[in-house]
Amino acid sequence: MDGHHKEIMLRGAAGRLEAILWRPKESLGVPLAAVLCHPHPLYQGTMHNKVVYQAAKALDSLGIPVLRFNFRGVGASEGSYDHGRGEEDDVRSALDYLAEEFPSVPLLASGFSFGAWVGLRVGCGDARVTELIGLGLPIDDRKLPFDYLRTCAKPKLLVQGENDQYAAKSGFESFAAGFHPEAIAATRVVFVPGDHFFSGHLDEMTDVLRRWLLDRHPDLKAPTPPATS
């Protein structure tokens, strides 16, 4: 792992949380810093998940510091699964760390699947978070309600696979159309080919992510070959 990749242990409410921070070699004046949350801990979800990893590389290629971490009970993280309640505290711990590392820099909360459910919910209510990215929101899973997004007016990008087995396209379109007007105005929904995991189409997903961020932050650097570690 090179000098701008840092393996760390965050201070969490249930104990230490295993994490990796990728930061640009020149991090002075970065326009935002990102937390990226992984999929369901009970179904082999970790910060090394391929969707999470590719999204992290896309952020890194734009010069955005990105923090991935393992939720409680995953990998070397202490604690145990808490049905999303304690995992919200884990996200807050990650945001706290980024806020200390990059004072006064706006934060981006992002996540894939379960990680989107938890990460965006915390991000909607945290004043330090100015924008959100959700990948593969499993809205058909009634155990993971995304109703909070209906009133969340922070700028957000939601990227879905056209054949997501946990969120039918027509159902997702209806879901997003039911947002409050101010939330609709702040939300961009993009469908790309592929299933829930964007299998065979990760490049399309990351291209959408990059374009949205470059549109919002023209001062971001042009994409460069992303991290490989």
Predicted regions span which residues?
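Acidic catalytic loop of the alpha/beta-hydrolase fold
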Residues: 162-167, 197
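Catalytic histidine-centered segment of alpha/beta-hydrolase-like enzymes
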Residues: 79, 194-206
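Catalytic histidine neighborhood in serine/cysteine hydrolases
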Residues: 178-197
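Alpha/beta-hydrolase active-site loop
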Residues: 51, 81-101
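Short beta-strand/loop motif that positions the catalytic acidic residue
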Residues: 152-153, 158-160, 164
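Gly/Ala-rich beta-loop-alpha elbow adjacent to hydrolase catalytic centers
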Residues: 111-119
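Short, surface-exposed "cap/lid" segments of acyl-processing enzymes
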Residues: 26-70
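N-terminal cap/lid segment of alpha/beta-hydrolase-fold proteins
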Residues: 1-29
